[in-house]
């Protein structure tokens, strides 16, 4: 099983991750990881921090001569902004007299609950660790799983279907055409858009909406569409709750900062229809074997992969740090006041799509390892190839 821990504060010296359980023999270069880190930094509506940081991963262990060796992989991404925060975020010195404590929580953020939970007299430590800056380390770690999956024929991609009231109208036929070449083809097309949308008209509407929100001191959320192609039938299990593929994918997405909802396939539309209009009927064709009439289940049935493309949707709330402050209070004096502003983005939905790709990568990689086992890439590739052949032949008359 692949697992990882991240560490580091938003304005500390660095972010880090230790990734354990990666099979040996997976070819990895720093450029592969840094490409994904650069994708996470893109998107119209990002804040001033992106002008400071150019995220680059340093690999300290677990790779030799460009291939994984089975041992834990240690990754570090240094924060360039640290030099401006050495006093405020000092690890061992006494706090300077001119450092003001943050005592006014922002509605919608971790500020108040984190302060109370950890017995803090200053909200700053809560801000530092709960910040979405932490997802830099998650993207670096998840890219390791993503590269492993690509080596066994599984691809992951995303695009943004809505930002604020600017909704996507991309035809399903266009998406299906892109997915035939693999989910990364769809992601590359989305990356050519400033907001990672596929529809140029809606892209323009989204940019206008972001500009309007920025001018008003407001923020915008949106909807992320995630696709996973090349998934073999039978990943996950209905035997126990913690082996259910849909549950693990949903948990991974909900763990991303500001993600408040997850949908698998067309789940919410399905809930309003009779079963006869929902379930994906089986079709046996002489040469192609088993196909389906549709994919409303999103590639998962009975908590297992059906062999179809997995389709997930994630809803991201608007960022909770607003230039136009909301009503709050001072947690020391209990006096009503307006919320404070912490440097932030107007819209980070495009970046969240890249984080979502990284998060589901590790879930799918673990489902593969659970089903097929193996400590070296070569033996896993052999087992999956055999499984694909047997599955295909089983449905050809």
Curated annotation (Swiss-Prot):
The keyword Transcription does not apply. FMN binds at residues 129-131, 257-258, 302, 317-321, 343. Pathway: Metabolic intermediate biosynthesis; chorismate biosynthesis; chorismate from D-erythrose 4-phosphate and phosphoenolpyruvate: step 7/7. It comes from Chlorobium phaeobacteroides (strain DSM 266 / SMG 266 / 2430). NADP(+) binds at residues 40, 46. GO terms for molecular function: chorismate synthase activity; FMN binding. Its EC number is 4.2.3.5. Keywords: Amino-acid biosynthesis, Aromatic amino acid biosynthesis, FAD, Flavoprotein, FMN, Lyase, NADP. Belongs to the chorismate synthase family. This is Chorismate synthase. Homotetramer. GO terms for cellular component: cytosol. Reduced FMN (FMNH(2)). It catalyses: 5-O-(1-carboxyvinyl)-3-phosphoshikimate = chorismate + phosphate. GO terms for biological process: amino acid biosynthetic process; aromatic amino acid family biosynthetic process; chorismate biosynthetic process. Its cofactor is FMNH2. This reaction introduces a second double bond into the aromatic ring system. Pfam families: Chorismate_synt. NCBIfam families: aroC, PRK05382.1.
């Amino acid at each position: 099983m692949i697992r990882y821990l991240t560490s580091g504060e938003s304005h500390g010296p660095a972010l880090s991750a230790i990734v354990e359980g990666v099979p040996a023999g997976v070819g990895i270069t720093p450029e592969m990881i840094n490409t994904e880190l650069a994708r996470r930094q893109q998107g119209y509506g990002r804040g001033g921090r992106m002008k400071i940081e150019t995220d680059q991963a340093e690999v300290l262990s677990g790779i030799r001569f460009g291939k994984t060796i089975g041992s834990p992989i240690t990754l570090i991404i240094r924060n360039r902004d640290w030099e401006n925060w050495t006093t405020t975020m000092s690890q061992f010195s006494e706090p300077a007299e001119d450092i003001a404590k943050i005592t006014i929580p922002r509605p919608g953020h971790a500020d108040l609950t984190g302060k109370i939970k950890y017995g803090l007299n200053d909200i700053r430590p809560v801000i530092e660790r709960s910040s979405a800056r932490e997802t830099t380390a998650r993207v670096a770690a998840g890219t390791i799983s993503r590269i492993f999956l690509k080596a066994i024929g599984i691809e992951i991609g995303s695009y943004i279907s809505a930002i604020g009231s600017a909704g996507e109208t991309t035809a399903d036929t266009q998406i299906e055409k892109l997915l035939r070449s693999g989910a990364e083809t769809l992601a590359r097309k989305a990356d050519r858009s400033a907001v990672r949308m596929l529809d140029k008209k809606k892209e323009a509407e989204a940019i206008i909406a972001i500009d309007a929100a920025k001018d008003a001191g407001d923020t915008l959320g949106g909807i992320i569409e995630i696709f996973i192609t090349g998934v073999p039938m039978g990943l996950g299990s209905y035997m126990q709750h913690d082996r259910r593929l849909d549950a693990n994918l949903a948990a991974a997405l909900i763990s991303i900062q500001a993600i408040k909802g997850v949908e698998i396939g067309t789940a919410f539309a399905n809930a309003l229809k009779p079963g006869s209009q929902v379930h994906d009927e089986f079709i046996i064709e002489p040469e192609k074997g088993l196909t389906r009439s549709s994919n409303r289940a999103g590639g998962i049935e009975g908590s297992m992969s059906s062999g179809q493309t997995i389709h997930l949707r994630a809803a991201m709330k608007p960022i909770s740090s607003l230039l136009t402050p909301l009503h709050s209070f001072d947690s020391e004096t209990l006096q009503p006041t307006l919320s404070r502003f912490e440097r932030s983005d107007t819209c980070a939905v495009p970046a969240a799509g890249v984080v979502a790709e990284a998060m589901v990568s590790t879930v799918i990689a673990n489902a593969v390892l659970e089903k097929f086992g193996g400590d070296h890439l070569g033996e896993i590739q052999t087992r999956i190839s055999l499984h694909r052949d047997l599955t295909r032949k089983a449905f050809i008359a």
